[in-house]
């Protein structure tokens, strides 16, 4: 299991601003280790955010995204005290979900 994501969500004027720091190596499959062997690809492929059972953000990532990606997005319809859930899935079908209360 990977390290937890850092998720912050703040509501201001009816708009929720979500900031997410995802811990992931994001290996492209193109780099080589010191012995000259190719490091296998291991990267996030999809990120989904939900609030009150509705998808509020959905994105596709690939090899061009850096290690430990940061994501910032906004959506309408959330209120203080609601929970925002962020889930990523990588190319090895590893999955991580973390949540944060909207403040």
Q: Whereabouts are the PLM-identified features?
A:
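Short beta-strand edge segments in extracellular beta-sheet folds
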Residues: 10, 101-103
């Amino acid at each position: 299991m990977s390290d937890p994501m850092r998720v912050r969500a703040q509501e201001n004027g009816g708009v929720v601003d979500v900031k997410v720091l995802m811990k992931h190596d994001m290996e492209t499959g193109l780099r080589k280790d010191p012995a000259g062997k190719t490091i296998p690809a291991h990267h996030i492929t999809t990120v989904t955010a939900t609030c009150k059972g509705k998808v509020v953000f959905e994105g596709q990532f690939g090899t061009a995204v850096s290690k430990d990606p940061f994501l910032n997005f906004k959506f309408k319809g959330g209120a203080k005290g609601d929970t925002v859930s962020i889930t990523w899935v990588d190319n090895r079908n590893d999955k991580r979900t973390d949540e944060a209360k909207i403040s």
